[in-house]
């Protein structure tokens, strides 16, 4: 993520403690977050108050994920710090300008968001498996894709 770092260093930083609710349904964020460390969960609550995790945001993933494209749309889900999180605070007007001035950083952010989308597809694929053993195997694949780091540029 070297190409994003010059942009992220220009942004203010805010910390959240594990368990902090960052956004609630109906909030219209005035800023976006880019986690520099830690994990933010996106979840919904059913009518019994049971949380249902939808997806997690890790390093360099936009929160809310549609914020850059639709900055004035209210969020539909809860966003909560799963771990202690340090985030860059992206201003609605300034952040797109910074990205447009650095095409390599913009491309890198696109790759990060694409990776997140692929992970979401794996998670959905996991949930629709009819057999428990298949759910476990697909969940393992999802976890490997989502949280593992490449050990070599030639090894996924």
Annotate each predicted stretch with a short phrase.
Residues 19, 30-43, 48, 59-61:
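Glycine- and acidic-residue-biased ligand/ion/polar-headgroup-sensing regions
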Residues 53-114, 118:
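Cyclic-nucleotide recognition modules
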Residues 22-28:
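Short phosphate-coordinating micro-motif centered on Lys-Gly-acidic
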Residues 107-156:
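Polybasic "coupling" helices that flank or enter modular domains
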Residues 1-18, 62-63, 67-70:
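Cyclic nucleotide-binding regulatory module and flanking cytosolic helices
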């Amino acid at each position: 993520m070297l190409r994003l770092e010059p942009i992220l260093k220009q942004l203010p930083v805010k910390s959240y403690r594990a368990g902090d609710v960052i956004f609630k349904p109906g909030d219209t964020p005035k800023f976006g977050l880019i986690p520099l460390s830690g994990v933010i969960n996106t979840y919904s609550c059913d009518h019994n108050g049971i949380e249902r995790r939808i997806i997690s945001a890790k390093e360099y993933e936009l929160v809310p994920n549609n914020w850059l494209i639709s900055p004035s749309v209210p969020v539909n889900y809860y966003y909560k710090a799963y771990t202690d999180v340090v985030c860059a605070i992206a201003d609605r007007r300034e952040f797109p300008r910074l990205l447009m001035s650095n095409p390599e950083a913009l491309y890198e952010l696109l790759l990060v968001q694409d990776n997140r989308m692929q992970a979401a597809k794996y998670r959905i694929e996991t949930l629709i498996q009819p057999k428990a053993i298949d759910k476990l195997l697909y969940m393992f694949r999802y976890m490997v894709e989502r949280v593992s780091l490449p050990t070599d540029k030639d090894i996924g």
